[in-house]
């Protein structure tokens, strides 16, 4: 007893029990949404238990009629047995269908909810997790939660009802037989203790290892070209073998413990079963019970044992549930983005749709969570019909600046606002809500699988073919698209497959232009274009009648002389370059 108290106190000090309780409450918040489905599933399960119990009783009567221990109508009893067998089949199938239907519904709704919460989670916090880990949590852990919500409490009620009803019948006919049937319970509970102690730790390690392997596979398949180019095939296959070996060793260590426990519990089960069988034979030999009663006892003995085992199995299921809940809580309880300005931004955009929207930044400072300071008192401005260039060495903060503009990152101090009006005095603070005012073309290939037209309509579902072609012309992509056999219906493979890097960039720019957002952000989005095409694309954007503000980051100064202003990001500030400095950069390039 003293050791148990010490163990409980140890868990309390470590916070394990409080954590499990918090995780249980979190699961309950989801579970109460589906109480009607849980009641339906429970009623079907209880009904099935009742039909099964009735079948055992009728089977007893049928055996006794055949052996002459009981008088009655053989045909009617046999018909009743068949009827209950059919009823059991129908209830079982109905329960299975309801379980599948409800499980799919609950699983999809919970995954949608978790997915939506992940998307509005603070971006910098979310990047602390590997995408493979996030996908594993969203898919495996969310499925575990949905399955547990539907099954755990209903099964607890169903198995308990099955156990109590079977025990009541056995006690009515022979209390001693019930004692034999229940002999295995304390042994099962005792032997399951060491397994349960290790189970939570093993489940945590297993979930982490699954996420690690998923992330490895995802990165490998996404970078097959690089793996081949650097002749890293052997290296990556060996890394996979190492990960698999670690996973196998971890699982086998736990499995050995499980096998030992299972063997011991099976031995106890055999002892209990044969004890019941021997006691039944003894009672029949003494004419204390009939053959039918003995067959019923043996049947109900199995029901009692299976019910206890099922109830015991709910414990590791609960442990697995709380672990999955904890892994999901790690994500959904991160800081959430604030979209309270949605309505204000919508009105702002409507009011200034014809005149355009720009942005102003004053004395902005930003430091990453890691402690790296990127900006200190930086200032910048960009207005409609302007092309603003951001230049500077790699790692100085150009991409970070665009993330701040998109409110993916939040500055610690300073003013950062969108602006409009003739003197730019109408302003609204930057927030996640202002993202709808931006079109963003990031570095790299951002095209999705599907046709060119489908890619364009991802950002504007109701756009016409003519509008798509016009956007392609602005980005200089129509030059090659019109030569394709299927035109805008041509297939784009995964990661822009089937098109060169420069072509994919022009398609990405066309998609951004098609959205008709007031502000366009191009992050090295013309790096794969030749100088002439790059200049033509930017000039087309400038000459477009739509009042657009354009901000580009670039390492190539060859287009700087067509930009309205050029900001050099250096020494944690944004400094406007004069014409002499720009010309010097162009000559030195």
Please state what every model-predicted region is.
Residues 112, 116, 330, 415-417, ...:
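ABC ATPase nucleotide-binding domain helical subdomain, centered on the C-loop/LSGGQ "ABC signature"
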Residues 406:
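Helix-to-loop junction immediately C-terminal to a conserved catalytic motif
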Residues 28, 36, 123-124, 140-149, ...:
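An intracellular "coupling" helix at the cytosolic face of ABC transporter transmembrane type-1 domains
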Residues 232, 256, 304-334:
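Cytosolic ends of transmembrane helices, especially the final helix of ABC transmembrane type-1 domains
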Residues 31, 99-100, 119-164, 222:
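Juxtamembrane loop-to-helix connectors within ABC transporter transmembrane domains
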Residues 400, 439, 444, 455, ...:
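ABC-family ATPase nucleotide-binding domain "signature/switch" substructure
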Residues 1-51, 67-80, 95-99, 103, ...:
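Membrane-integrated ABC transporters
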Residues 33, 37-50, 54, 61, ...:
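Transmembrane helices of ABC transporter permease
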